[in-house]
Swiss-Prot record:
Keyword annotations from UniProtKB, A to Z: Amino-acid biosynthesis, Branched-chain amino acid biosynthesis, Cytoplasm, Leucine biosynthesis, Magnesium, Manganese, Metal-binding, NAD, Oxidoreductase
Catalytic activity reported: (2R,3S)-3-isopropylmalate + NAD(+) = 4-methyl-2-oxopentanoate + CO2 + NADH
Family per similarity comment: Belongs to the isocitrate and isopropylmalate dehydrogenases family. LeuB type 2 subfamily.
InterPro entries in UniProt: ICDH/IPMDH, IsoCit/isopropylmalate_DH_CS, IsoPropMal-DH-like_dom, LeuB_actb
UniProt: Mg(2+) binding residues: D212, D236, D240
Function according to Swiss-Prot or TrEMBL: Catalyzes the oxidation of 3-carboxy-2-hydroxy-4-methylpentanoate (3-isopropylmalate) to 3-carboxy-4-methyl-2-oxopentanoate. The product decarboxylates to 4-methyl-2 oxopentanoate.
Keyword set includes Calcium: no
Listed name of the protein: 3-isopropylmalate dehydrogenase
Cofactor note: Binds 1 Mg(2+) or Mn(2+) ion per subunit.
Native organism: Saccharopolyspora erythraea (strain ATCC 11635 / DSM 40517 / JCM 4748 / NBRC 13426 / NCIMB 8594 / NRRL 2338)
Entry EC number(s): 1.1.1.85
GO cellular component, one term: cytoplasm
Pfam families per the UniProt record, alphabetical: Iso_dh (PF00180)
Subcellular location: Cytoplasm
Gene field: leuB
Length: 347
């Protein structure tokens, strides 16, 4: 496997180092190329994502990203010029966010039940497509628009991906989350596409919920959800809530996926660069390690992915959550666990 690694900013390099430590135990022959994209490169050269680097990234099987963001860089520069550009250039139309409450992890929900859901969020359309602008700026008559783009092609491919994932899971249940009673045009398109694709998956049960009702049920009855499919904006919001009820975004992994596999998909922990704790060796690398599991599953290394997931599950069930250990110590534990007898029995 040819892997491009973007350690990024803040705690990104620290958690990526531990994720690679675990990866080396399960796929030792991985060919790794590191890229110094992020705040430091921008300060030094003014570059965010040179065309030459983008071309090199395309030649890899997958990309592992640590975190991007630094208070010394004006807000939005790294996000738009690096993260969003990668997403659009590499056609990462599926944003995949699993949310599982592992044994041993405390949820802020009083009676959460068994939480094991996957949110399939559309990643290249909606209001993030950049269709909008300002008229009469800085006047009392200023107008700001942000147009949500929803194409039949874009909606169908993410809905098909969500149905395929639902069909492969034990519960075989899919929920469309939208706001069809108000966003009638986009809502109609999403609803019709889900209905059409559902005919090809008679084994998958289908439900619909308004996005506001979804936020309620994620807190009061999160175990009802299996696979959720939704648009870019709604997905951005509810995935953070899903992370919060399953132990926080410090345990949340994500994948930015080109389901056609024409471009390398990118995997990253959901947490940010956390510059306030960077360099202290206290960042939890678990989300980065779980991102490696998603990566391995995507490239066809499912057995290795199960070992990594089982190692994380064992560690979370047995660790002292009030003092989980230094960054390197957690990485060492997980690297040892992926080859242990305990994990072999669970994987």
């Amino acid at each position: 496997m040819r892997l491009a690694v973007i350690p990024g900013d803040g705690i990104g390099p620290e958690v990526v180092a531990e994720a690679l430590k675990v990866l080396g135990e399960v796929v030792p022959d991985t060919e790794i190329t590191r890229y110094d994209l992020g705040a430091a490169r921008w300060h030094a050269t003014g570059e965010l994502l040179p065309e030459s680097v983008l071309g090199e990234l395309r030649q890899h099987d997958a990309i592992l990203l640590g975190a991007v963001g630094d208070p010394s860089v004006p807000s939005g520069i790294l996000e738009r010029g690096l993260l969003l550009r990668l997403r659009f250039e590499l056609d990462h139309h599926v944003n995949l966010r699993p949310a599982r409450l592992y044994p041993g992890v405390k949820s802020p929900v009083s009676d959460p039940g068994e939480i094991d859901m996957v949110v399939v969020r559309e990643g290249t359309e909606g209001p993030y497509a950049g269709n909008g602008g300002l008229l009469r700026k800085d006047t009392t008559h200023e107008i700001a628009t942000e147009v949500s783009i929803n194409t039949a092609f874009g909606v169908e491919r993410v809905v098909r991906d969500a149905f395929a994932r639902a069909a492969s899971r034990p519960r075989k249940h899919l929920t469309l989350v939208h706001k069809t009673n108000v966003l009638t045009h986009a809502g109609s398109l999403w609803s019709r596409v889900v209905e059409e694709v559902s005919l090809q998956h008679p084994d998958v049960t289908v439900a619909y919920q308004h996005v506001d009702a979804t936020t309620i049920h994620m807190v009061t009855d999160p175990s009802r959800f299996d696979v959720i499919v939704t648009d870019n904006l709604f997905g951005d919001i509810i995935t953070d809530l899903a992370g919060a009820i399953t132990g926080g975004i410090g345990l949340a992994a994500s994948g930015n996926i080109d389901a056609t596999r024409r471009n390398p998909s990118m995997f990253e922990p959901v947490h940010g660069s956390a510059p306030d704790i960077a360099g202290q060796g206290t960042a939890d690398p678990t989300a980065a390690v779980l991102s490696v599991a998603l990566l391995l599953d995507h490239v066809g290394q499912s057995e290795a992915a199960r070992r990594v997931e089982a190692a994380v599950a064992f560690d979370l069930a047995t660790r002292d959550h009030s003092a989980p250990g230094a960054t390197f110590a957690i990485g060492d534990r997980l690297a040892a666990l992926v080859s242990s007898r305990e994990v072999a029995q669970q994987a």
